[in-house]
Amino acid sequence: MVSTRAYAARYRFAIRNMLAERLRQLPYLVHTNRELGLMLRGMKPLAYFMNVVGREPDICIGYWRMFDRHVAVGRLIRREMIEAHPDQPPLACRKLFYALPGHEWRIDAMLMLLNEPGAWSDDRERRFGELLGYEQRQNDHWLTHRTG
């Protein structure tokens, strides 16, 4: 079994290599791969992960276990949903949410947002960011400078 310290070191190394250059150059701290630390400091109210069941990278499973340690002692709330993959019905998707206590409402709001019919829009992107804990100025910048 890998120690928590060794795993954290491997995880930090993976973070540096996984973040896209575009995200690293944003003028604010991007939450991606920093969710747990931000949540434990009270700076992020909600984390959301989605993967195909059975195809989760080991690094993700290990990261979720780190969250689950805090769920076990009441620092975080966890909700998991498994649904048919929208584009490949034989596959299943896991939607995994972690929220700070008192912010469980964000999970329900995020599920409503993700299940809204119609094309993804700037308004939906903004609400997505707000639910995850990004500030208005950060969402403004993202919407102005994102591509694709």
Where are these regions (language model features)?
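Activity-critical C-terminal alpha-helical subdomain
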Residues: L132-G133
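A conserved ligand/cofactor-binding region detector
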Residues: V2-E116, R127, Q136-D140, T144-R146
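Short, 15-30-residue, compositionally biased linear elements
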Residues: G118-W120
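An amphipathic, hydrophobic-aromatic interaction surface with interspersed Lys/Arg
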Residues: D122-G129
